Amino acid sequence: MCFDKIKYLYVLVLLCFCSCGQSYIEEITTEYAQFKINDKGYICQIINRENGKNYLPEDKPSPVLQLYDGEKYILPTRLKSEGNKWTITFENNSEAVVSKEVKSDSYVRLSLQSLTNRDSIQAIAWGPYSTTISQYIGETVGVVRDTVFAIGVQALNIFTTEGVPHLGDDATGAFYINPLPGQTVPDELKDQVGKKISDINVNEEGDMPEYVRQWRGNAAVERPYGSDIQFEARDWRKEKVIDYVGRRQTVTAYDQDFIGSAIALFAVPSSEAVDVIGKIELQEGLPHPLIDGEWIKTRANQNPAYMLYEGSSLDNALNYADSCNFHLVHIGDIFKSWGHFDLHTSRFPNGVEEIKAFTDKAKARGIKIGVHTLTMFTSTHDAYVSPVPSDSLAISGSSILTKEITDTDRDIEIESPEFFTYLGETRSAKIGTEIIGYREVTKEKPYKLIDCTRGQFGTKPSNHKSGEKIDKLLNNCYSGFFPNLELSNVYGQRLAEVCNETGIGLMDFDGYYGGSPTGHGCMGASMFLKQWFDKLDEKNMISCGSSPFHYWWHIYSFMNWGEPWYDNLRQSQVNYRLENQRYFERNLMPGMLGWFKLEQTYRPEDIEWIQARSAAFDAGYLLRVDESVEKNGLKSQLFEAIRSWQELRNSHLLTNSQREKMKDPKNEFHLEKTGSNSWNLYELTLQSNNVHKYRQVQTGEPLLSKFVFDNPYDNQPVQFYGMIKDGGDKTGKISHLKILINGSATIEIPAELKEGNKIYSDGKNIYVCDNNWYTLLKYPCTSSALWSKGKNQVSVQCDFSSPNAPVVDLEFKALGNKEQIAGK
């Protein structure tokens, strides 16, 4: 494969010497652009008709089409134009007939009609089409743009996919060290700037470094001169074995090749790019879903804040949604198993009828219901697996038994270990109707599967004869399996049936890295989606997921990813969330922040941290809510903050300056609703880690701790939070807590406090609370307790019941720089 890459780069260098000269065999004109093609088969200029600017790099013409034979790219040498078609001759004397048509005065439709001398040709490549544009490179949508002009390509069928053939057929991406202005790279990595690094699993690592950039696809790629836009189509009609994600994978034959591959090429003002894609969808029969009569890409509030509820009280789900003013509720997994997708579960014992009744009830309250599936993951207890496994389960490859086995033998001899050395999570193989698990494969002949578990997942252990076929099953990361290409289509149809029957409004296709495990790349992933979408009775479904690719761009409403709530809120995948906003912006996608969980310990400042980021990026998010929120004494304030912030966000009244400040996760804000369409916005300062604990002091010396709080705002009543934390003595207590402000005003808390208690001041009163902010005691706060502008001296003292009594951890709070926001 390294050799292939070298060949490919060499070809790109050669293109620099294919001078276009001054004459063109064809000049194609659309409303906004002119495409100039020479008699060698190269696009030499893409001109913005408004200002005459050429967006192709000088001396770098782009081939209309290339051929790929598995080792090298075969370039065009001549192009002949006849009416609505081109005949392109290549270096190997192959001739391609490409139809061309300007449609809606907006784009050029190109389609491969035929190819001669094609026996050795494995794939064709559209382009790559080189541009000088580098500001926004849409690796998924296939559009590059700056603030003025956009150039893009859309694949017009599912077997035309993003990328270039020598890099495979997935929407491959990568991580690079490439700091943005103001970001610092560690000294030991400074020589790696601009270079690719190993993939980062943010769920395992917790986050990604801020100086790392992630690219999620290859429909468009960054180049020194700007960018390339690139698409391909492959001949799938012959079975082959490839190296795929660390394993050997048999790619089964499928009756599809590159004849008929088609693209739409366009160049328009940047502000028109999304609209042109909409025209292409309608003209070419691509998915064009509407929600409430509006196209998903331009509808208002296309990326809402919404809720996940996985509890059993579905009435609570609707009530919590009303409390947040959310109109979309994700209720999680509703399936008995993945595969057959049976709907009879403990939450919905009566299946379809019960789910439909609930979605109707929600709809009457203005709420859509969404559900979750891991796309093509197949449960081990599904009927496709147990008790008789389907022959349509995906396999990586096969061998044969070289020795007869009984139903109790635990070592199994096989002819070849080729497909069995990649163990995966379940290490499973299928012999006839029995699934066996194995611990390892011996490295020398006779090759054996060692320590086998017979009759895995409820299948029946059996005797097997020498010469019987043994298949290595493909495992997913949930220890289940995958369907083959044909069965995946059945899955797509079944999930459409579920949508049609139940009235759900959102389908969350989680785990789409399982979309094409069979090696059929984006085509296989797109086949599943097309089956689902085509079989929907109504196309007004919201769909989302975590791994978008080009075809899915047309269908999906927004990107969704989850479970990053295991860490402290303000450290929970923050860089990853921000990096995704850059991805959305360059790919004409609505912003989303991912998942959060409404914890029973949250304060208003915590939920407002989420809301400020949502408003900054105009990004939705998913908020997981369950009955634990009932334990939160500040619950009503949390819900009020969510409602107010989302109302402000959707009003689009924030200035660019305000939004830029909010994009910095280190900045805190408070929003105060003052009317039906008016708010006060405050900047907020929180200073934490002011810890007062027991220590030895000299006789007569007071046991106190001194802190300095720098208030950047005007004078104001003292506000703070305090957490009483473990000091080692679980039965220990503190009492007579006093907080002295600037040597004059004393705040006294006469209550006895223990580990888990919390205290706070809102400037008017002092509240003693349990661990979840439920008020136990309330005391008035002295009116003389004020934060002065600038540095404030704070002294804290109390009585400790023992040297290991609890400690007091204080967080000082101030707000200011009020800005009034009002709509009409």
Can you say where each PLM-predicted feature lies in the sequence?
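Bacterial Sec-dependent signal peptides at the C-terminal "C-region" and cleavage site
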Residues: 17-25
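Carbohydrate-recognition beta-sandwich/jelly-roll modules
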Residues: 27-329, 361, 368-369, 505-506, ...
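Glycine-rich, aromatic-flanked loop segments that form ligand/cofactor-binding clefts
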Residues: 269-289, 322-330, 354-397, 466, ...
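Aromatic-lined carbohydrate-binding/catalytic grooves of carbohydrate-active enzymes
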Residues: 294-398, 474-497, 502-526
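Carbohydrate-binding surfaces of carbohydrate-active enzymes
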Residues: 355-371, 377-379, 392-399, 613, ...
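Autoprocessing Asn-cyclization modules and mimics
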Residues: 375-461
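Glycan-recognition surfaces
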Residues: 380, 384-398, 473-490, 533-633
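Intrinsically disordered, low-complexity segments enriched in serine, threonine, and glycine
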Residues: 454-462, 466, 709-824
